[in-house]
């Protein structure tokens, strides 16, 4: 009962449809304006058009303008100083839009911003709620790339050797069903056996190269 729901929008036509539906349901829908400050996946460019769209949200009958939302997942420099420089530069576009909107007489109380590598930067800003790109569990790639975030292991996958198809090869049952395939190999860290080279990855299996597979027991 204490939960509140909101959504994002970056298009005037969709915004108007949302307002119509909310009116029909006799509801007030909470809406954030989604911005594109470099990610180029969703969001509206933070310019005059975006300011006018936010104004229309604020003036609509059944929508409540909550603020600005920006996901900057395109910023992934490993070096913190470089990452912060890019993050600050791209966030200046958001602050510029905030100023434009406030010049229209509309106050922006909150900006929701962040991505996994940038949330430590945004958390120090005033009037910004942090929204990490990955909110709960990160994969080993983040720990390797962002030493400053000091991730610690929170979960471990258990796999077994299911076959030894050749002298220097082993097949484990840690395929796509267990480990996401979106990133290039290596996709997982094999604890205590980091030198095992990951050769191929399919739906149910991962094949690794080893010095001598006879040292490993199937099962």
Tell me what each language-model feature is:
Residues 1-80:
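Active-site-proximal beta-alpha core segment in soluble small-molecule metabolic enzymes
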Residues 82-219:
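Active-site anion/phosphate-binding pocket segments in diverse small-molecule metabolic enzymes
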């Amino acid at each position: 009962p204490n939960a509140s729901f909101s959504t994002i929008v970056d298009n005037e036509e969709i915004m108007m449809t949302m307002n119509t539906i909310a009116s029909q349901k006799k509801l007030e829908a909470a809406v954030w304006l989604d911005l594109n400050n470099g990610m180029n996946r969703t969001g509206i460019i933070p310019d005059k058009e975006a300011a006018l769209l936010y104004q229309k949200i604020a003036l609509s009958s059944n929508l409540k303008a909550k603020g600005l939302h920006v996901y900057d997942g395109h910023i992934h420099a490993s070096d913190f100083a470089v990452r912060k420089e890019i993050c600050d530069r791209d966030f200046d576009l958001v602050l510029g839009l905030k100023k434009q909107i406030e010049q229209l007489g509309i106050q922006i109380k909150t900006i929701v911003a962040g991505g996994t590598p940038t949330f430590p930067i945004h958390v120090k800003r005033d009037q910004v709620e942090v929204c990490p790109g990955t909110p709960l569990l990160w994969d080993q790639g983040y720990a390797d790339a962002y030493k400053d975030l000091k991730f610690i292991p929170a979960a471990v996958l258990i796999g077994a050797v299911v076959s030894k198809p050749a002298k220097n090869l082993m097949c484990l049952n840690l395929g796509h069903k267990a480990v996401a395939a979106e990133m290039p190999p290596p996709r997982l860290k094999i604890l205590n056996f980091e030198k095992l080279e990951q050769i191929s990855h399919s739906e149910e299996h991962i094949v690794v190269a080893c010095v001598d597979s006879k040292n490993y027991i199937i099962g």
